[in-house]
């Protein structure tokens, strides 16, 4: 059985891209050529989406007709809703773009302030030919800068960014609910089949039976109700994966960061562990001097600001006479081995000492993701 499944997976999808096997490539080219230019969803469809949709549609076509006559009215209300929602959010996630263009660039520059930790001002995208807004990233697959870039999703053939992140979260939630509900309902129906085949009073279903007998009994029930049983097994195996993705993105919202930003914070964590990061305050370093690139609409309207300055050195604390780099967190030490240490700087020993101005607290982070008004006042 495992051998035939392996052959099927190979012909259906390559292990690296989940979508370059001969069958899926043929289906993808056929569908794309037929629907090309008719709608953004079909013009950007790829093998990964064909593979995903094929599993989803085939599973529902196997499960629902077989289960429908056997479930109550309550379940008949839930099944259509849970079956259709993933398609709605998948569609919205694919067709909604978060691209930064010359037309909306000014608005994007005013959306988020630069924290001068993982995002510094003054960096220009050489491909798009404009300054990079805070929290943005250029995607080489989409060939565009993406607002509040999270990641490029191969299953969507689209970047997950500010405009479609809430659709992506809703897709994960609806998939998790559908898979969990499907596995529970499926095994409930298979249990009914098992009761008809082997009553609970049978010695084969005694509490003292060994694992081999238990597996054989359930194998008989699943084989007798193959449409429901096979889909129930598939949903039971895939539900933890969807839930794990949902939990991971819930954690990212709680932490006030994106997938892209979590990688940047990981780099800072390594530098902190190596003793390369030092901190001070803007008031100590600059005094009452103001800087033109700090007085921006985003700086004035974003609810959280920080007085902290971070620098990365070669392990030596900043010395008197150093120079700060305007576009990075590096410094130029004074070319004098005898220069005294600048006492305004202290070594950062933990990531907890570093401010994340994009973290507004879980509920406000969630409201910001869903484009709802943030309740916190500017401070």
UniProtKB/Swiss-Prot annotation:
Subcellular location: Endoplasmic reticulum membrane
Annotated membrane topology: Multi-pass membrane protein
InterPro entries: Palmitoyltrfase_DHHC, PFA4/ZDH16/20/ERF2-like
PROSITE patterns: DHHC
Pfam families given in the database record: DHHC
A GO molecular-function descriptor: protein-cysteine S-palmitoyltransferase activity
Entry's EC annotation: 2.3.1.225
Keywords: Acyltransferase, Endoplasmic reticulum, Lipoprotein, Membrane, Palmitate, Transferase, Transmembrane, Transmembrane helix
Protein task: Palmitoyltransferase that targets several endosomal SNAREs. Palmitoylates the SNAREs at cysteine residues close to the cytoplasmic end of their transmembrane domain. May have a role in the cellular quality control of transmembrane domain-containing proteins.
Domain-level remarks: The DHHC domain is required for palmitoyltransferase activity.
The protein, known as: Palmitoyltransferase swf1
Native source organism of the sequence: Aspergillus fumigatus (strain ATCC MYA-4609 / CBS 101355 / FGSC A1100 / Af293)
Gene that specifies this protein: swf1
